């Protein structure tokens, strides 16, 4: 009788879910109908037509990059399972996917300056790991997808249906101010060396804009996929979908750590209301760093206190700082607060280990800190900081038990209630003092998300107050993260004082915008997801899901002239329209080719520069003096993104008070005479030259005249083809091959010895 009742209940539940999906199909159709006059045209056929010309290039690059990333992630996940066979399979997979990012940063800093960060090195290490796992396979634990994981998969699918066409239609990442990244990546690929303090080929921005963690990871993908021409641009643009998928699952995992599995899944869907998916299409650290932030915090603070996760989380957090100094630094503050929670649990052993791990994380981030603040350190100092940081994390985490329980729940309960209530009161107090406070701006952009967030915090207080509820020991860390929005207002005011307008302080000028546009919206989704998850788990899951998805899919409110829609709460279908319109027409307006930014007049320049590199005239020491009207990404001939050569712009419309260019190489025409007197090896003109240069600069030969572009080469430059030492450049590969032979030999010996089990 009970079995029959269960079957009937299951059948009723299936029918209810079927009705929900049919209802959402109707809602989606109505949403698409409402968007028929939307300025952004929602059309998959138009997007397909737009990508046809570049599809052979982008699809082949995407396949190669994705295969290398997936294979490498599988090997790392296998190694994690060998170290900790009882770890959750999803955590092992995420550790592999995110761990490759960290590994790219580590290998880049350790091997890049030595000229050993190359395709042979990467594939030989991958082969070594594959062979070792082949002979010593880890146990693969069984796993059934959880509610949160299913919701994260749904979020990934809802994003991919429009972002995948956008990715394949975009050989160059379709977002402004992101092209410094592929320029730095291409420089590593072109010249086969990573120079930490001379890797900003783009030349427009100062050192604070560099993101070595991201740049080295993308270089790893470009080298691993064996891309050459356009490797930097393609490595950036063709990871658009997988890097967003990693961000989504990292969000689920952090939601699970802070609140619950379902809350994490709901949080991934709420990301559609934020600007993160709009900005992540540019694959720059500001947005995609949240993939590392979410994963690093989720692992490091996981309530199971699994030592493997603590170690992985600490290393990933260090890479998060290196992938965006400001947001990664914020994450370190949250992690430090989490360690204080361990102290409140009276677990002094874990507290000390956490402090040591965060010290190791800080050492891992030292190369980025030195680069961003323009404090030159020798190679051995950078390599030692990475190696020492990793060693500290491994040693500290190894001294912990495999797992440990949450202790002193009463103290945690009081701490959670106090912090959450204090945050709510602080926001209200700040709003009473300053009408246009940071959270006022956030609430104007994201009213529903803000409402759900505070409902979630109220629910967290209520649940923490009751003894009969499932514990959420680290819920208040979401409030700690959001409290940075209050502190940031004062830091922003301080950073804009004249005495702090220096190259080393430039990153602090962005504190306010990064907090209200990125950091706070990201951390709003967790308590907001918890509020919805409570209703989902305790009332009717299908009904709550239908209401939530209706709110997310249908465009309830439209801005009449959506020029900049990124930060405003928008629907999933509007997100589709944004992506498909860009896929159909291309992003880079102002350029003759809206996808590559290089048309028939610019392509000969790239071809010629590649020949100059092959001839040995252009090296890592070469700078091209570049005359341009301005350095806007909509008009500048951005040759570094396909060549990696240093660009030194001289602009007609120069603004020396542009603080974001402080520490960069942009100069005005008033400095042209001095620049020419320094006898640069090449001079590129994309605007008519001033009288000081004449028709042809003295001592230079014109080697290109293509439309509006002219390139001059100093007449004493000689061709000196670079010599490569095959054995040296393949030292790591040779060592890996020897390692493979040793593994195979030992395995054969073990197979022939009956005493070996």
Positions of predicted regions on the chain:
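Membrane-interface transmembrane helices that cradle and orient dolichyl/undecaprenyl
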Residues: 83, 293-310, 320, 340-347, ...
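Membrane-embedded, hydrophobic transmembrane alpha-helices
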Residues: 1-145, 344, 352-436, 713-757
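Active-site lumenal/periplasmic loops and adjacent helix-entry segments of GT-C-fold
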Residues: 150-294, 586-596, 627
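Signature aromatic-anchored transmembrane alpha helix within multi-pass, membrane-resident enzymes
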Residues: 358-362, 416-420, 470-476, 531-569, ...
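Membrane-interface helix-loop-helix junctions at transmembrane boundaries of multi-pass membrane enzymes
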Residues: 143-149, 345-352, 400-415, 457-498, ...
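Membrane-helix boundary/interfacial segments in multi-pass membrane proteins
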Residues: 54, 58-59, 114-117, 202, ...
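Extracytoplasmic
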Residues: 550-737, 741
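Membrane-interface alpha helices of multi-pass inner-membrane proteins
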Residues: 299, 309-325, 358-365
């Amino acid at each position: 009788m009970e079995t029959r009742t269960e079957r009937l209940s299951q059948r009723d539940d299936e029918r209810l879910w079927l009705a929900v999906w049919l209802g959402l199909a109707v809602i989606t159709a109505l949403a698409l109908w409402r968007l028929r006059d939307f300025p952004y045209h929602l059309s998959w056929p138009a997007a397909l037509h737009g990508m046809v010309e570049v599809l052979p290039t982008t699809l082949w690059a995407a396949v190669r990059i994705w295969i290398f990333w997936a294979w490498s992630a599988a090997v790392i996940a296998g190694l994690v399972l060998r170290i900790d066979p009882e770890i959750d399979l999803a955590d092992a997979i995420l550790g592999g996917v995110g761990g490759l990012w960290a590994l790219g940063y580590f290998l880049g800093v350790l091997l890049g300056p030595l000229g050993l960060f190359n395709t042979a090195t990467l594939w030989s290490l991958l082969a070594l790991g594959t062979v070792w796992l082949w002979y010593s396979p880890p146990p693969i634990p069984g796993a059934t997808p959880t509610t949160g994981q299913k919701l994260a998969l749904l979020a990934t699918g809802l994003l991919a249906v429009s972002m995948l066409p956008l990715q394949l239609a975009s050989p160059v990442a379709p977002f402004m101010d992101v092209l410094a990244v592929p320029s730095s990546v291409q420089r590593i690929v072109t010249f086969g060396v990573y120079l930490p303090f001379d890797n900003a080929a783009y030349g427009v921005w100062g050192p604070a804009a560099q993101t070595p963690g991201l740049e080295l990871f993308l270089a790893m993908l470009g080298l691993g996929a064996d891309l050459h021409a356009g490797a930097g641009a393609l490595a950036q643009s063709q990871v658009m979908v997988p890097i967003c998928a990693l961000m989504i699952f990292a969000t689920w995992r952090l939601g699970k750590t802070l609140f619950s599995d379902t809350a994490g899944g709901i949080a991934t869907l709420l990301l559609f209301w934020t600007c993160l998916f709009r900005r992540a299409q540019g694959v720059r650290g500001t947005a995609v760093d949240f993939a590392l932030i979410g994963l690093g915090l989720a692992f490091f603070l996981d309530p199971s206190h699994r030592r493997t996760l603590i170690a992985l989380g600490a290393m990933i957090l260090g890479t998060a700082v290196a992938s965006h100094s400001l947001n990664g630094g914020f994450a370190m503050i949250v992690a430090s607060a989490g360690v204080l929670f361990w102290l409140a649990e009276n677990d002094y052993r874990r507290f000390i280990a956490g402090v040591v791990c965060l010290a190791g994380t800080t050492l891992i981030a030292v190369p980025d800190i030195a680069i961003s603040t323009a404090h030159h350190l020798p190679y051995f100092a950078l390599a030692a900081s990475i190696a020492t940081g990793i060693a500290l994390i491994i040693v500290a985490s190894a001294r912990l038990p495999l797992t440990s329980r949450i202790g002193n729940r009463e103290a945690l309960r009081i701490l959670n209630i106090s912090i959450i209530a204090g945050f709510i009161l602080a926001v209200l107090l700040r709003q009473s003092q300053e009408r246009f406070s940071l959270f006022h701006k956030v609430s104007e952009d994201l009213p529903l998300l803000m409402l759900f967030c505070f409902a979630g915090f109220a629910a967290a207080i209520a649940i923490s107050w009751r003894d009969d509820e499932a514990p959420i020991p680290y819920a208040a860390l979401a409030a700690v993260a959001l409290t940075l929005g209050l502190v940031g207002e004062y830091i922003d005011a301080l950073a804009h004082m004249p005495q702090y307008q220096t190259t080393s302080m430039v990153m602090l000028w962005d504190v306010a915008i990064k907090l209200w546009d990125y950091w706070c919206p990201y951390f709003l989704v967790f308590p907001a997801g918890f509020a919805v998850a409570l209703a989902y788990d305790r009332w009717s899951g299908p009904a709550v899901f239908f209401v939530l998805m209706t709110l997310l899919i249908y465009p309830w409110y439209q801005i009449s002239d959506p020029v900049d829609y990124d930060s405003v709460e928008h629907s999933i279908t509007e997100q589709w329209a944004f992506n498909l319109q860009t896929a159909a027409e291309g992003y880079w307006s102002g350029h003759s080719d809206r996808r590559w930014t290089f048309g028939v007049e610019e392509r000969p320049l790239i071809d010629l520069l590649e020949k100059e590199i092959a001839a040995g005239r252009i090296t890592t020491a070469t700078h091209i003096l570049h005359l341009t009207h301005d350095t806007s990404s909509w008009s500048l001939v951005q040759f570094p993104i396909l060549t990696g050569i240093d660009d030194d712009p001289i602009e007609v419309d120069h603004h020396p008070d542009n603080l974001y260019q402080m520490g960069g190489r942009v100069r005005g025409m008033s400095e042209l005479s001095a620049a020419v007197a320094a006898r640069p090896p090449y001079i590129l003109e994309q605007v008519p030259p001033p009288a000081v240069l004449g028709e042809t600069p003295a001592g230079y030969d014109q080697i290109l005249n293509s439309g509006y572009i002219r390139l001059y080469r100093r007449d004493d430059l000689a061709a000196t083809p670079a010599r490569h030492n095959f054995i040296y450049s393949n030292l790591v590969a040779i060592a890996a091959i020897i390692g493979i032979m040793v593994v195979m030999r030992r395995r054969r010996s073990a197979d022939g010895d009956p005493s070996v089990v």
